[in-house]
Amino acid sequence: MLLKIAHLVGKHTIKFAQSVGIFSLFSFIAISSIIKPPLYLSLIIRQLLFIGFHSLPVVAMTTFFSGAVLALQSYTGFSRFSAENSIATVVVLSLTRELGPVLAGLIVAGRVGASIAAEIATMRVTEQVDALYTLSTDPIKYLVCPRVIAAIITMPCLVLIGDIIGVMGGYLVGIYKLDFNSTAYLTSTFQYLEPIDVISGLIKATVFGFIISIISCYSGYYSGKGAKGVGRATTSAVVNSSILILISNYLITELFFKV
């Protein structure tokens, strides 16, 4: 019994270490290929539209209602301590530091990550990736680099727009639902907001964009055979991206805001 358990643990440990090694090599090749010609500008523009513009409505709606709910919940809690004047500050700091980047990252991971993994996995199953080799085209340069570049560019833009819309959601609830004075609310919003709060959120967004794109491409590129392989690649891309987003979010927060 103990030998079986040890064998099982060792088997999964070796498999995990092998996956980490392959992923590290894949990431290194992808990063080094970004600076090499050709650039495939048309593919980058196409991915910019897909990852950024088409994700904007979902991100905007999510951050708007998150800001609105945050204002309501903050009022419910802070009113017990007569600290209602701090609601605007809590809303803007929570959105710019944490909620904006994390929510946008998880949404893009679910929407874009699944699509990227499924698309590349389907190309792998139908041997389109192998066909690129016969055309003297580097599959990683052609399939991975445009998506990584587009994700790194668009994620900070999505987060910045989402932060603004989320603050607007909190503002509208504060003014029309909680009867705050408009001028006082806006003053409280920007009184304690510092550049580092916004910058840290944008850096998180950039890291999240890289995580989503590289993991999704990796999951699709090394997918299994058949429809089952495509499904597993899609699930793996979303789950692993979401987990790494939350882990990296803590690490970046620890780096910028040490207690």
UniProtKB/Swiss-Prot annotation:
An example Gene Ontology CC term for this record: ATP-binding cassette (ABC) transporter complex
Molecular function terms, GO-annotated: phospholipid transporter activity
Keyword flag Cell membrane: yes
Compartments where located: Cell inner membrane
Pfam families per UniProt: MlaE (PF02405)
Membrane topology summary: Multi-pass membrane protein
Role description: Could be part of an ABC transporter complex.
Descriptive protein name: Probable ABC transporter permease protein RP096
